[in-house]
Amino acid sequence: MKIIKNILLVISALSLSFGALAVDTSFPNDKVTMWGDFGGITLDVKLIGGAPYDPLYQSMIPIWEERTGGKVKILSKKSHFELDKEIKVDIAAGNISYCVLSNHTSFATQYGDIYRDLNGIIPGDYLAEFVPLVLEHSTVEGRLVQLPQHSDVSNLWYIKSIYEDADNKKRFKAEYGYDLAPPETLDQWKEQAIFWSDPPNFYGTQYVGKEEAITGRFYELVIAEGGALFDDGWHPTFNDEAGQSALQWFVDLYNAKAVPAGVLNYLWDETGLGFATGTVALNLDWGGWGAYFNSADSKISGDVGLIRFPMGSGGKRGGWSGSHTYSILNGCPEENLDAAASLIWILTNHEAQMHEARGGKLPTMTRVWDDIANEMDAEGNAFMSNLFSTFKASMAEDAFTPPLIPEWIPFSNIIYPELQAAILGDKTVKEALDAAAKETDILMQDAGYY
């Protein structure tokens, strides 16, 4: 209960920390602008919501409305998992009349032909500012169906002081036979998490435990262990030795009580908030939490370390990656297209990405990577400089997307309950993965892959 109470204590402070980011309303560094006179136009939109996302809307949408005369009507704002379900209901009901949708490169392919092609709607000079590979991942069957706002990859955060404590070093070496330092491998991560744990007051680590979140975490451990989800012919292979080793890692941590008992209900807010309470030693998470972890509202401010994702036995690091994006839908009236393009411009432009990067989110514009690094160096902000150098290396050397196919989420819906069943002990690791592989084989056959 203590960790839950601590999480609740910091929720109100969270929005303040994420929101304390300045915007230069003159947009001096934007080479391309897309202002217009949109008086009388109201754009219906559905957006991802939550503490890491709302401050951008709160900052940028009022500026857009004041400068253009247009209005934004937010029909829905919720987590991506809940928004995904809502979009599918909308598609089934033929209710896709809104203009702008929060999207994600991992989700976009499953929604079919609901999108406007942004080529020709968004100026080429503006598109040229984005990282080419990110635009490639935003393209489906030759059509640019989404404009990327920020990218994600995870690295391992840790509480520095517990690693610097002389007594901890002595006890750890006596028990495990090697010097205490932030983990370099998945095995060390597991050993250290067990060493640190003192439930229910303190836990060695944690993980997101449901929906596509745990699917993605399992996926990157499979890769780190030298495996793959599918072979070249799209037959499932995740129930092999590498997949079993990956799932056993989650099971062992749960059985050792090295993670909170409620992790199978955790998503991103729970892991981020939990780490900031100072009750978790090691936390695999996105860069976008970085500024909050080190803020005055966090109980670990000034005591936060960061390393790249540890190596698996396959000689690879985890690096499950994707980008948060915005799409314009076919249901958007022709007379509203320029306004819709202008809105997603202000949510993805240089100023918006600098705004987000100051909190730790990873830019999708090439120039912003350099500009944010220069800004942090000039300020002498060693913490944020290290954040961007670490995550830049991960994006360049470790990052990989999930399969960008329409079946990704249906596949996730098959496998994640089986992962949970193994973690809870209701099935063995092999039983769970074999069951998921059998159902996945049917899914892929029905989809026409073989």
Where are these regions (language model features)?
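Short, polar/charged alpha-helical segment
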Residues: 26-36, 51-71, 415, 433
